[in-house]
Amino acid sequence: MENLEKLIYDLYKKNARQCTNEEIYNALLIYTKNQLFEKGYQDGKKKIYYISAEFLIGKLLSNNLINLGIYDDVAAFLKENGKAIADIEEVEPEPSLGNGGLGRLAACFLDSIATLGLPGEGIGLNYHLGLFKQLFENRLQKETPNPWIEKHSWLTPAGVSYTVPFRGFSLKSSLYDIDVAGYNNKSIHLHLFDIDLADESMVHDGISFNKKDILHNLTLFLYPDDSDDDGRKLRIFQQYFMVSNAAQFILDEATKKGCNLHDLADYAVIQINDTHPSMIIPELIRLLTERGIAFDEAAEIVSKVCAYTNHTILAEALEKWPMDYLLDVVPHLVPIIEKLDEKIKAKYPQENVAIIDKNNLVHMAHMDIHYGFSINGVAALHTEILKTSELKAFYDIYPEKFNNKTNGITFRRWLMHCNHPLTDYITSLIGDEFKTNATALENLLKYKDDEAVLNKLLEIKTEAKKTCKEFILSNTGVEINENSIYDIQIKRLHEYKRQQLNALYIISKYLEIKGGKKPSQPVTFIFGAKAAPAYVIAKDIIHLLLTLQDLIKDDPKVAPYMKLVMVENYNVSAAEKLFPACDISEQISLASKEASGTGNMKFMLNGAVTLGTMDGANVEISELVGEDNIYIFGESSEKVIEHYEKADYCSRDIYENDKRIKECVDFIVSEKMLALGHKENLERLHHELVSKDWFMTLLDFNDYVEKKDQALADYADRKTWAKKMLVNIAKAGFFSSDRTIEQYNNDIWHLTPAK
């Protein structure tokens, strides 16, 4: 650590002990960036370009130190100088470049691409203010800007600029890079394009701003409010700015390597992460034709370069843009898209596979499927539903294009970084092979009946719960009991993820306690979720949870047995405290609606037991751990799809014929709730559950209550519960993103790893 010591002195003319935490952080930032630069970058003839609207990378300091192999040395140096690395981490702002599972997956994938020595890059946008910072005021979500870019940051200007044409004007870009460290390997770049005139001062009244002022607003926010025409067009401006820069950058890199553009597929493979980057297809064709390549050949070249990952079964999430919008924003792409559509209609005249439909809507996913060489789902069930239901018409045409790549998570962040005690204990039992070969965790199974090992796992969990308790007190002001069961649901707020189902369970327990039925073990229900600013019902669910939080906290008859806490501004940093502390992992989406999920994997890896439906990757978790080590409830995906096809689900029938369900649903608009909450929000949510309930909350309620009660009862047998924990940890190896990326490379990308 002599170099670090010298750097600190050179910067501040004092030793580390005399420095503030901010000074130490800035010195470590410079030191770590230098270390990454010296280690070098992955390169090769052919590269993967992973293009995504979001990268939820989290704080980078500790993760980079771990991947560089110097975390322990730095932590020891700081301790010698009276500093704690945890305090230094608190100084670092979390990059506001993502929101949910899509962005976190992209971040995990970059970590694995670098660790496996694959030549690759991530490409996205440099958002200044993120999605938004969530505040709770008057038991409602309030959105404010979430700035993160400081004078000293992980961003490095790359000295690269392109011109992006729009209708009536063009914009110059500037490229900034963030280094993504491979574990004991070289780094790769996350390339983030920005505009030079982004003006954060134009934001007012929360996150309101002039959506028409593209010169100054283009890279301010991730997913700007699209509830009006200007917001929807701004999203198109953003997406095209991202893909035009990406396309120009990719062609530049290939050309510098001596690529004849007819052979672009030998130099580049582009992974389109969801539909936001779909315009890369017509944009690449435009650029190739400008370079003298005939249209049909350009389309053929692009279709050998682009691969598409589908992340959703929700039809509304598959982007469809009105042609009028495209004419207003990127008119030069319209003739290309029309020509691509004509080529498809000449071969496949059926309406349901058209790129441009009869309403003049451009279907981005359809373009990706027709002009990409690979289409993958992200969990076995998800891919099966795509092939047999949602994208069946395309599967019938292109069966060879479809494949599954079950999602994964990087164990470097979600175990080694966020749970040092568990990592160290696993290493003491089975060595450190699991850090690069995650399936080696199965070696833990030989300890599943070892009482000393099981007791130690429980001890580590208790310590994690104490740390989490401190975090929750500082975040919410609510003091929770570390000896209670931690039942956690942390994910984007959406009706299909069914936070409202969990809330109804909490209401049922509240009513039981008020009726004199005391639980044998106290429970803490923990939520973390942001609702999209224009998603009214999702914000109503947050209001319900915050109202219940206060109702329970202030009731002396109930509070000793049960607490509900809603973490404010849930992000990666919060997740790193919550995953290690969890006992019961809530994965309760309506079967057939969650593509995969990755929170389920992070909980499992940290020794939580899943309570969930047979949806997404829960199916594969269930197969791996066996029925004794997971709690499964709810209607099957087949039955759910059948209900939608027949339109025969009626929540009102269930509500009117089930006394317990009616009592719980009606409690939402009871006198107690209305005295604390807002009548409009609570009545709207009540009406939604009774009259619509599109995601079949009431259908699964009774089974959910039964299985959740069973899980809470089983927790009392500590040895058996610890065995469930151990089996979950041991079987989590399949869900390493290293495995996922190896499969992408073997089946889709065909890159040569660096020696």
Language model region names:
Residues M1-K755:
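A conserved ligand/cofactor-binding region detector
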